[in-house]
UniProtKB/Swiss-Prot annotation:
One of its GO terms (cellular component) is extracellular region. The keyword Signal applies. It is found in: Secreted. Expressed by the venom gland. Keywords: Neurotoxin, Secreted, Signal, Toxin. This is U10-myrmicitoxin-Tb1a. It comes from the Eukaryota. InterPro entries: Pilosulin. Residues 27-36 form a propeptide. Its main location: secreted.
């Protein structure tokens, strides 16, 4: 079975990148966010929800007024 030169080249590049990769170290940020997980997601969804409500309510009110005026 013959190995293609492209896959052989990519394999060599990956191996060399792993061997010569610098050591990394995780550092804590001073301004780490205290909220994480579902609390953070709920906060973002609340902000997005309020923006949507502020944009949609006036439009919905216009449609409701138009439909009520057409019925009369």
């Amino acid at each position: 079975m013959r190995v293609s030169y492209l896959s052989l080249t990519l394999t060599i590049v990956v191996v060399i990148a792993i061997i010569y990769a610098p050591e990394t170290e995780a550092k804590a940020w001073a301004d780490a966010d205290a909220e994480a997980g579902l609390g953070f997601l709920a906060k973002i969804m609340g902000k997005v929800g309020m923006r949507m409500i502020k944009k949609l309510v006036p439009e919905a009110a216009k449609v409701a007024v138009d439909q009520l005026s057409q019925q009369q």
